[in-house]
Swiss-Prot record:
This is Actin A. Belongs to the actin family. Pfam families: Actin (PF00022). Actins are highly conserved proteins that are involved in various types of cell motility and are ubiquitously expressed in all eukaryotic cells. GO terms for cellular component: ciliary plasm; cytoplasm; cytoskeleton. It is found in: Cytoplasm, Cytoskeleton.
């Protein structure tokens, strides 16, 4: 047996992207959208060997004739049949392995409903026949990948944003903040504010175009009011080429869109805290003795933290909150888009971790609820 046949599989199932690969690697082997596409019109797809279902990149490539669905919304699996299809695609088509020969480490957002991880556990053992599995909390894995054991992780992906304070390797659950606002909400907000330019994006395929605009052109304003004033004085626009070859100009929407991360009321979440307030509230729920260490190690994780100027703006907003003597340090690792996966790769390759796996025999004895006692 080759080493790879023995190696654990690490699969970070995000609301927007699946990151998968092997334990011990320094980056995921495969990254693809967490989407399942079905033909809008059965007749139109005759050429594709009558396939009824497309997953990931293939669904993305054929999006013009497909209805696209994301099986994970706000970090919670809402369609288990489709989720199974995504896992099947991950194992057999992307990684090209038989899951019956590999332990599997999966990831999950904190404060998810208990049945979500129970069902994940059940499917891994009963449908895919894995020998052992584990579910890691996304933010904790991110901190491992940054080489720290103490810090507060702000993890913002496509479906969920959460702040998790961790001290000496232990997460402090009472202080976790979670808001169901992340990248997908920004994409929808951008669709809305681009309508004023006369462009309408309505279908699931057009939403993917707007996501590309967001990822390529949007940035965080260091000072929003100043940026608005400047953009009113001089028209500053960036071109974006649409799939049909037309070019649209994108103006102040480029910084108005990510502003919602600091002012969630812009997208109708009047009660939700912004990134800076979430971080601040989480730290203040921790013991006074550990707060300084947490302020000094605010670690960003996830694709929605990749906007230009976001780390600087976050530090500025937090330092404006009391007590003013605190000087926050925001750490923005360049690989933070994949830091959850990297943390899973590190954790699952440690010799000390090997006793942490939930084995098939433990599952047979205790059932899916074993996941709560063995995975924190």
């Amino acid at each position: 047996m080759s080493d790879e046949e023995q190696t654990a599989i690490v699969c970070d199932n995000g609301s927007g992207m699946v990151k998968s690969g092997f334990s011990g690697d320094d980056a995921p082997r495969h990254v693809f959208p967490s989407i399942v596409g079905r033909p809008k019109n059965e007749q139109a797809m005759m050429g594709s060997a009558n396939k009824k279902l497309f997953v990931g990149d293939e669904a993305q490539a054929k999006r013009g004739v497909l209805a696209l669905k994301y099986p994970i919304e706000h970090g919670i699996v809402t369609n288990w049949d489709d989720m199974e299809k995504v896992w099947h695609h991950t194992f057999y088509n992307e990684l090209r392995v038989n899951p019956e020969s590999h332990n599997v480490l999966l990831t999950e957002a904190p404060m998810n409903p208990k049945q979500n991880r129970e069902k994940m556990t059940q499917i891994m053992f009963e449908t895919f026949g894995v020998p052992a599995m584990y579910v890691g909390i996304q933010a904790v894995l991110s901190l491992y990948s940054s080489g720290r054991t103490t810090g507060i992780v702000l993890d913002a992906g496509d479906g969920v944003t959460h702040t998790v304070p961790i001290y000496e390797g232990y997460s402090l659950p009472h202080a976790i903040r979670r808001v169901d606002m992340a990248g997908r909400d920004l994409t929808e907000y951008l669709m809305k504010i681009l309508m004023h330019t006369g462009m309408t994006f309505t279908t699931s395929a057009e939403k993917e175009i707007v996501r590309n605009i967001k990822e390529q052109l949007c940035y965080v304003a260091l000072d929003f009011d100043e940026e608005m004033t400047n953009s009113a004085k001089s028209v500053s626009e960036e071109p974006f080429e649409l799939p049909d070859g037309n070019v649209m100009q994108v103006g102040n929407q480029r910084f108005r869109c990510p502003e919602a991360l600091f002012k969630p009321a812009l997208i109708g979440l009047d009660e939700a805290p912004g990134f800076h307030e979430m971080t601040f509230q989480s730290i203040n729920k921790c013991d006074i003795d550990v707060r300084r260490d947490l302020y000094g190690n605010i670690v960003l994780s996830g694709g929605t933290t990749m906007f230009k100027n976001l780390p600087e703006r976050l530090a500025k907003e937090i330092s404006n909150l009391p007590p003013s003597s605190i000087k926050p340090k925001v750490v923005a690792p360049p690989e933070r888009k994949y830091s959850v996966w990297i943390g899973g790769s590190i954790l699952s390759s440690l010799t000390t971790f090997q006793s942490m796996w939930i084995t098939k025999s433990e599952y047979d004895e205790s059932g899916p609820s074993i996941v709560h006692s063995k995975c924190f």
